[in-house]
Amino acid sequence: MKKSMQWMLATILICGSCVFTSCTNDSKDNPSQPEQSEKTYSASTRELITLVNSHAQLKSLLEKAIAKGTEINPDRETNPAQTLSEYYDFVEWAAHAMPWTVINQPEGTDIFTRIDQSLNLFFFINDIPLEELDGQSLYNNSLQYFEPYRSWLKTFAKAWGAYLDSEDSWNQAYYDIVVKEDTFGISKGWYEDASNWKTFNQFFARKLKSPDVRPIASPEDNSVVVSPADACTQGVWQIDEEGYIVQDEDAGVQVKSKKFSSIAELLGPNSQYRDAFNGGTLTHSFLNVYDYHRYHFPMTGKVKEVNIIEADYAVGGTITWNPKTKKYDLFCDTPGWQSIETRGCVILETPDYGVVALLPIGMMPVTSINWAPEVKVGAEVTKGQELGHFLFGGSDFVILFQSGISFKLKPQLFSHQLMGEELGRLI
């Protein structure tokens, strides 16, 4: 896993016959394509059109972002939405597309790259820097954080999520491709019977067939913290005495304001533990497209608090176009962006290591945090017990330890771990 990860979240398969063409040419260049007034759009696209037509500044900003995107990447194969009407066509298509068909890719491109590039493409325009938005205390000066477009992204995400919850999103052909693509581990015998998967999201949140396929390291020793998910480790950061993540000045810091590196902000307004981790430690791990997307308790303890913090459906990191590789790159290894994303938070009280915060982070485009039924305040839980699951979208998992607790990461930075393997030790 590279430090400047091309991640994406999200997840699988290919439909070679499904090629997006409706927005690769404007109607004036394609007489067979109906004019905008003749087209029938779904509710989420109609909502965007209404917002743009009634909000002059939004229209100006969106048109400017599209124009800048076209200047950066004029290739219509990898940037098909180059006018406002084409953008409407694009989001209409994307809301009913499989994650690997949003962007055209050369024949033979693997599923991981197709999904990664499809999702990065969707947020390429949304993440274009706009000087008009400078100084407005946004995470960055891009359209995805500007109201009312910010709220519309949630509408879009829910529409896409609804499609991926439908039986239209899964069939035998998709399953066959997943089996062929060994990175998803289907052939390893880890997962439940495939007949349980009736939708894409059921596949995405697939269950293990038995706890035995993910043995838990040192189950009786709480000083051994296990990986909460199949994920790539991203590092360990200190939290200062005021509750802010200590950033590496040489790391190309993405956090533009102390607000976004605040642990109190990360834990959300309803937590009683907003200051409990001042002087402590943060570690986080990134779940990739092909990973098992259920997360588990990394330690044994008692649940003290359970919250879901509704926030943005934004990219979080920074997306750039690389003209040499002809690919979109996402940079999201530096922490801080998690505080803008919709996320969950469980506070776990441990016998010997104080309270620990466990935060599954839902990432764009279809953020979804779901708790296991047993996860309730007062519940006694054991290391390796299921905590919850993600549906479609990118995924990250943050763990916070209190001051005075030393955490040493075991695996090499950016290495991949299976859930239950040793993540590190507490001293």
Regions found by a protein language model. Give the residues of each.
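Bacterial Sec-dependent N-terminal signal peptides
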Residues: 17-37
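Bacterial N-terminal signal peptides that target proteins for export
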Residues: 1-9
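Hydrophobic helical h-region of N-terminal Sec-dependent signal peptides
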Residues: 9-17
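Intrinsic low-complexity, intrinsically disordered segments enriched in polar/basic residues
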Residues: 2-3, 29-33, 371
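Contiguous, well-folded functional domains in the mature portion of proteins
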Residues: 34-427
